């Protein structure tokens, strides 16, 4: 009889604790809408590999010297040559684009709905206004073919479109090797439309000899909400980079001797590039109902490019 009572006593505290109410606080997170999948969808409901990065509050806390600052800690994405402003940033997604000698190949780049990738598959980001980047969507895997042939991945970049931000903003970023980025953003808001003006002046002498660059970027974006179902966006971007020097590669013994020196051929041939880039485009968005919409865009680009290579033809 004593043993039976002892067993009941041991079980009794278990029933007491099992009736304690759960004290874990529950937090409801806002839905994340993905726009790079052609149809706006909830991130939890799409069977795709998508990464979304929002920089609305964070863009003022990075150097903004390269687009690689906006793609850190993204699975399957690798960047290199972020400090070589002559050969520009190289990006690969799951191996696509890794064999590119310079620039970006095999990956579709879209800025505010307008393709930044040329018909031959080459992409450049030297005209991207980094101070206006508000969000980045990265689509990996074979579903990137929704955006065209040979798309090993898609990077959709959205710039500032919210006129509720500060109507005038000045910012200055300074770093080592005489790096400076002076930016001014002006937002003019009307009843149903707004105009965003952004100017970025960037300079740097570079870590190595013959690796400095100079760039001026002007970006205008006009947004007009015609009614509840129609919206028109007009934008123009102009970039003037009179020089971006290329220091070239070094051998191991040259690195051990002086890692900041430039390759001799690059100095002898004065290797650099010069770019003037103009892009303008108009997009129209028509929303028929909650389940269907129509997007159309027209754009024009002109790129004046000059470069000097470290060898004879």
Language-model regions: role of each:
Residues 31-61, 88-92, 107:
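N-terminal periplasmic "start-of-domain" segments of outer-membrane beta-barrel proteins
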Residues 174-203, 208-246, 271-289:
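Transmembrane beta-barrel wall of Gram-negative outer-membrane proteins
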Residues 119, 138-139, 166-169, 201-206, ...:
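Extracytoplasmic loops and strand-loop junctions of Gram-negative outer membrane beta-barrel proteins
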Residues 67-70, 90-94, 107-111, 124-126, ...:
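N-terminal periplasmic accessory domains that precede
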